[in-house]
């Protein structure tokens, strides 16, 4: 079985991928399309931008190579750090040599690697190409959503979505921004404004995809935090997977504020002191923005998010 778990950055999808990846016969693949996390992700970003926006009928040799590798279980390395280290070495090669080496390795991996019974691919860069992926690979699609204010607060702390406008990517602008009648933030926009705008854009696109495909699964990070064990078990069974004791153990341990997640570096997935004021991460995760943003910043983020047709995916839903 193939599963694509998608959402914005900081939406809780890493937590979910780690839990679901512990079901029997399952491999979780983290961010194969991330420009900073995978050499194929970097090569795709150089051609299509950080967030590719492909229509189902469009063809892309490099995007196809990326997802071919992802859905057989990713590169044959044990940890994400190994993929990043290898990618950094390869990226320093002359372009012609690098491209030839990477495509040879990618084709060999996708053809020869023995695929696990289940592969869960976790991605935060595929928002605008979900139909393209669904049409070619037929995975079960899972969209992870979260209160956008909590996403904005986390992104602001980590410097994610704060430096450039995703909506300035030509294909994203043409396919999403212009039809929505939106204008991207100016060059002097604050980090909170830019993060909120990018989160609003991505969340809108994810909501539209979910509305267009009622058969896709939508999971709420906020709901999972309220009662993690039974709700994760329900999500697991909804996907046709089996609940295991290892999954229960992970959910329980991950509630510890000192717990470090797997699937990213400490720099990318730190457990900041502002994530909780007590002994439970999940019990306060749904109000995280109140500790990470000032009241003025919350008001600023709300004002930006109000520009988007978020409906019941908005901050006050």
Please report, for each region that a protein language model flagged, where it lies by residue.
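Conserved phosphate-donor/acceptor-positioning beta-strand/loop module used by diverse small-molecule
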Residues: 122-123, 133-157
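PAPS-dependent sulfation machinery
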Residues: 31-120, 166-186, 282-283
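A conserved segment at the C-terminal end of the G1
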Residues: 14-26
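Short catalytic/ligand-binding loop motif for oxyanion handling, primarily in non-cytosolic enzymes
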Residues: 14-17, 35-39, 127-130, 149-154, ...
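Short beta->alpha connector loops
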Residues: 123-128, 258
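Glycine-rich phosphate-binding P-loop
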Residues: 5-17
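PAPS-dependent sulfotransferases, especially Golgi type II membrane carbohydrate sulfotransferases
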Residues: 1-4, 180-218, 226-317
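Short His-Asn-centered micro-motif
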Residues: 6-7, 120-124, 144-146, 220-222
């Amino acid at each position: 079985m193939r599963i694509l778990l998608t959402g914005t950055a900081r939406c809780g999808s890493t937590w979910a991928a780690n839990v679901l990846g512990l079901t029997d016969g399952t491999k979780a693949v983290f961010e194969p399309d991330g420009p900073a996390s995978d050499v194929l992700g970097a090569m795709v970003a150089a051609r299509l931008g950080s967030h590719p926006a492909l229509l189902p009928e469009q063809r892309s040799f490099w995007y196809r190579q990326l997802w071919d590798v992802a859905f057989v279980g990713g590169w044959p390395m044990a940890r994400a750090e190994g993929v990043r280290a290898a990618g950094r070495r390869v990226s320093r090669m002359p372009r012609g040599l690098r491209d030839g080496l990477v495509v040879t390795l990618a084709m060999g991996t996708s053809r020869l690697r023995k695929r696990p019974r289940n592969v869960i691919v976790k991605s935060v860069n595929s928002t605008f190409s979900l139909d393209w992926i669904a049409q070619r690979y037929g995975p079960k699609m899972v969209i992870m959503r979260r209160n956008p204010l909590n996403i904005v607060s986390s992104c602001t702390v980590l410097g994610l979505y704060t430096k450039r406008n995703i909506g300035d990517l030509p294909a994203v602008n043409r396919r999403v921004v212009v039809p929505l009648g939106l204008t991207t933030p100016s060059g002097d926009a604050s980090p909170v404004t830019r993060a909120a705008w990018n989160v609003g854009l991505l969340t809108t696109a994810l909501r539209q995809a979910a509305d267009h495909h009622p058969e896709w699964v939508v999971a709420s990070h906020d709901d999972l935090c309220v009662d993690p064990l039974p709700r994760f078990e329900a999500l697991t069974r909804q996907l046709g997977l089996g609940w295991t004791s290892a999954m229960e153990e992970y959910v329980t341990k991950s509630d510890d504020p000192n717990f470090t997640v797997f699937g990213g570096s400490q720099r990318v997935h730190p457990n900041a002191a502002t994530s909780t004021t007590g002994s439970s991460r999940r019990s306060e995760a749904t109000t995280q923005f109140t500790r990470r943003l000032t009241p003025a910043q919350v008001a600023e983020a709300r004002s930006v998010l109000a520009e988007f047709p978020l409906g019941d995916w908005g901050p006050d839903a």
